[in-house]
Amino acid sequence: MSATEYLRVSDLHAFYGESHVLHGMDFTVRRGECISLLGRNGAGRTTTLRAILGLTGRRTGSIMLNGREVIGMPTHRIAQLGVGYCPEERGIYASLSCEENLLLPPQVGSGGLSLDEIYEMFPNLRERRHSQGTRLSGGEQQMLAMARILRTGARLLLLDEISEGLAPVIVQKLGEVIRKLKQRDYTIVLVEQNFRFAAPLADRMFIVEHGQVMAEIAQGEIEQKQELLQEYLGV
């Protein structure tokens, strides 16, 4: 993994109307690294992803993406810099087939995966490629949501609660996909409540509480930081 810094979030504040949600988020992500934002519901993790893409209301602070300040850019410009977002609600087009959903996204960078590469990574989608979005299971919809952003050529992937509510066999498959993406030098920000899913995948974990980073835990520090994990996550 390169030590080159790909994303730096500094003193990030974000608002929904009058509600002050993020209170000075600070973290960095290196190129090819997977980091996880861990915390309870309402901690500000999803808002952080949305703020990176400019999908919240007012933002202050700094978001440096591959050396460029993006805090004042509109969402479409940020996406065009190679950012892919997989929201918790997935956003599958119900009236389109699985394959039509895959063909829909615009290109934001070179190197987007071909349909053959997608189907090799997600064999279930090959089998279901002619099925309408409404006929896909929750796990298949989650695979499709991830596959769709891989088609765009994005190199920074913002993944929001991708394991939530899914069968263990699907969660295991998604973990395998993330490992493959790390091998391909994708940079990943993983928002998760499922510590057991995130911990083996993340190079570093940031515990988020009340819209702030409370602690950073490296992959090799999990054992000695058990008390901290218990305090904030109950694990």
PLM regions with names:
Residues 57, 69-89, 115, 127-130, ...:
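ABC ATPase NBD coupling module
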Residues 161-162:
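Walker B catalytic motif
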